[in-house]
């Protein structure tokens, strides 16, 4: 859309959405700051005293399993550890909405599974609203309460919405093996497959 309005919790959004936290695919950590200082940076920007911000940063690093890595710099961290620092950085600000754009897509399969379970555990503790963008249908089903399928671009739009009535708490590896998961995957894939084929066809036409 090129016109219209956006409301967040019933109020018009006219600038930066300060009630939302963001986690993207790319690495956004500051290379000259250690893990503690990266997490504390946003808190300091929002007015926390430096000592308080560092203490809160240590608390959040502990929650994501990196309490012992607080003084390590990004180049000393693995891909999964960097993502956990970024997750702590976002959650430390206590956003009411989490906007996550393919945050785990660059990770290996094992690390990705660990990070997905980490996200589920942290979500269970606070129950924030999460908008999670992914190209991985299995990931969408394993994590979500609803899956919205978008049409092939460039003028992408919602073409289907599915309720994910799988029980919580979940383990992303174990839930994939349940009959209910398989049934949901089959149902959603019937719609998604058509959009994937349209995208491939459009790409083939552009190359000829």
Regions found by a protein language model. Name each.
Residues 40, 44, 51-69, 121:
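Conserved ABC ATPase "signature" region
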Residues 98-101:
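Catalytic Walker B motif of ABC-type/P-loop ATPase nucleotide-binding domains
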Residues 3-15:
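Conserved ABC transporter NBD signature motif
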Residues 87:
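Hydrophobic anchor residue at the start of the ABC signature
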Residues 33-41:
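Short coil-to-helix segment of the ABC ATPase nucleotide-binding domain corresponding to the Q-loop/switch region
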Residues 16, 36, 62, 70-73:
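Signature (C-motif/LSGGQ) region and adjacent switch/coupling loops
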Residues 72-75, 93:
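Conserved signature/switch motifs of ABC ATPase nucleotide-binding domains
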